[in-house]
Amino acid sequence: MGSGASKNTEEDDDGSNGGGGQLYVSLKMENSKVEGELTPHVYGSLPLIGSWDPSKALPMQRESALMSELSFVVPPDHETLDFKFLLKPKNRNTPCIVEEGENRLLTGGSLQGDARLALFRLEGDVIVEFRVFINADRVSPIDLATSWRAYRENLQPSTVRGIPDVSINPDPKSAECPLESLELDLAHYEVPAPAPSANSYLVYAADNAENPRSLSASGSFRNDSTPKAAQRNSEDSGVTVDGSPSAKEMTIVVPDSSNIYSAFGEAESKSVETLSPFQQKDGQKGLFVDRGVGSPRLVKSLSASSFLIDTKQIKNSMPAAAGAVAAAAVADQMLGPKEDRHLAIVLVGLPARGKTFTAAKLTRYLRWLGHDTKHFNVGKYRRLKHGVNMSADFFRADNPEGVEARTEVAALAMEDMIAWMQEGGQVGIFDATNSTRVRRNMLMKMAEGKCKIIFLETLCNDERIIERNIRLKIQQSPDYSEEMDFEAGVRDFRDRLANYEKVYEPVEEGSYIKMIDMVSGNGGQIQVNNISGYLPGRIVFFLVNTHLTPRPILLTRHGESMDNVRGRIGGDSVISDSGKLYAKKLASFVEKRLKSEKAASIWTSTLQRTNLTASSIVGFPKVQWRALDEINAGVCDGMTYEEVKKNMPEEYESRKKDKLRYRYPRGESYLDVIQRLEPVIIELERQRAPVVVISHQAVLRALYAYFADRPLKEIPQIEMPLHTIIEIQMGVSGVQEKRYKLMD
């Protein structure tokens, strides 16, 4: 079957040749430049595709505004399938546009040869090209049968186990009023989403990390020394990364190696703590973390003058937060050693273990909580310094030139992170393999007396996940942006991985968190050693609850309320006639979008306008969250903004100057809302099934800002229109966003 065959064609652990399984194949093509009258199709050989007749080509479904997909199931040993992409006009009298080049070959779930771009020649000899992706996963016949059964069956209501805030509506057939059906496909209601955010699946996570400080305004480093030991192409291509200058224009300044390379002894403490679930009084599950030996020590009493000086020094390192986060930050600042005021999370792990994904997700979470957090990716430093053409030989431990170059950029990234912390930064995420004790000791020596280091090691023993990550890496990483042969890129990356495996040393020193087989979300282990303090505890709790299982999260405001019509703040009014119409359309949308999702749920606030909006949705459990209630307007509740301006001008001006921090008298600020939403975010991260969140403008602004990685200062200005659904698709490749406008 050739060397390019997918992992799914290999024998199972029991020695069978996949006789009990099938391959679920997904063909995807970017279509951001496809005109509205052209739709992507696939046609090809029998029996899998259908026909070489363009009129019988299979349409690709719109997975998002920028991606189309065709998926099908085949045996692992299926015959070679040859096919092509084509663009089909809606006008039948207009000829189809077939992609240029030879036929594509699919064998064992893998595309053979050069298959990363699809080229089309439009009118006027205009050439457009789109990236092409393929993914093949083995699925069992039982899974296929379950999916088909879920598709065919209507979800029947189950009994409620005495929980007052959970309900399931009756079957649609017995509903008193008919739903307002959507006349067309859901794609008809899709509207353009905002420009892709930093957290978008279209953006490689490492590219969003910090740029080197020594990168000048013109985009070049100082000095120049590029190792020539291991480039895949002998000629200097001068290719840029994200608009950055080519490697030949870059030079770099590295700290004196004599002050860096000397390693010191390992930390003596080896106590490993364990995590155990416990039951709180209100029945909610929590997590107990044994502090061990790392509890903060009390500092000596200070005079009044020295105390004032110290508070001035730490003012810039306090989080832009409220509630528990702010209180905990004060305690950590006052009680802990000076170096503990700054926290460095140092990633450890082999390539293709999800380090960068974890780093980006943790950065997003901490920023959303109000902590000044930055992501430093050593791979980005390396690419900016040495280019993107480094082969697997560059990463060999017996290649002294490669080792020196990689150590230099790691030291530079660490220096930049420490310098940023000394200017007031709070949490730095240091993203690299850091796979040897020598490298980790170097980092600890550089951080000594300046910041506290916690190692975060990701271990994965699931070959299927590793293989998937490798293929995603080749598709997304700038390291392989010039490698047109996909399978050649896979082979090179596997060689790189083998080089790291030969010298890998698990973390046993210092403070650390080990995540063992946690990425799949199906269990695994997490170990913590010498961990204490509020923020490290929150990080552990967040990591325990995150996973990579793809699932959609739908965010929508309630239907228009009577207070919306009157322009009044807050309140608990019913929905208007327009809101009732939206409630019916929303129910029809949910029925179409989540028809096969038996485990989906509907979350609302405790206010009646969200419950009335959800009332027409049937067949799914509904959960009320007080945390999803609208921002508390305090004494201004029920007033219009004009009344506030007239009767409380000082409050009106204070809110106008800083909507993020402004707190209504006896009410809440946006920062207060963020703090009460943290349990909601953790639960959304933990969920493996779709969730529909029906809430309010301020609350949805805060939730959306988390998923889109928007700065805190932008939250009060985020547009959150009525009668619009925002679909957030969470998965291994990042976050995809769609928007549906059901009515004006």
From Swiss-Prot:
Keywords: ATP-binding, Carbohydrate metabolism, Cytoplasm, Hydrolase, Kinase, Lipoprotein, Membrane, Multifunctional enzyme, Myristate, Nucleotide-binding, Phosphoprotein, Transferase. PROSITE patterns: CBM20 (PS51166), PG_MUTASE (PS00175). Residues 17-122 form the CBM20 domain. Residues 301-549 are annotated as: 6-phosphofructo-2-kinase. Beta-D-fructose 2,6-bisphosphate binds at R557, N564, G570, Y641, R655, K659, Y670, Q697, R701. Residues 1-23, 213-245 are annotated as: Disordered. Its EC number is 2.7.1.105, 3.1.3.46. Beta-D-fructose 6-phosphate binds at R382, R406, T433, R439, R496, Y500. GO terms for cellular component: cytoplasm; membrane. Synthesis and degradation of fructose 2,6-bisphosphate. Regulates carbon partitioning between sucrose versus starch during the diurnal cycle. This is 6-phosphofructo-2-kinase/fructose-2,6-bisphosphatase. It comes from Arabidopsis thaliana (Mouse-ear cress). The gene is FKFBP.
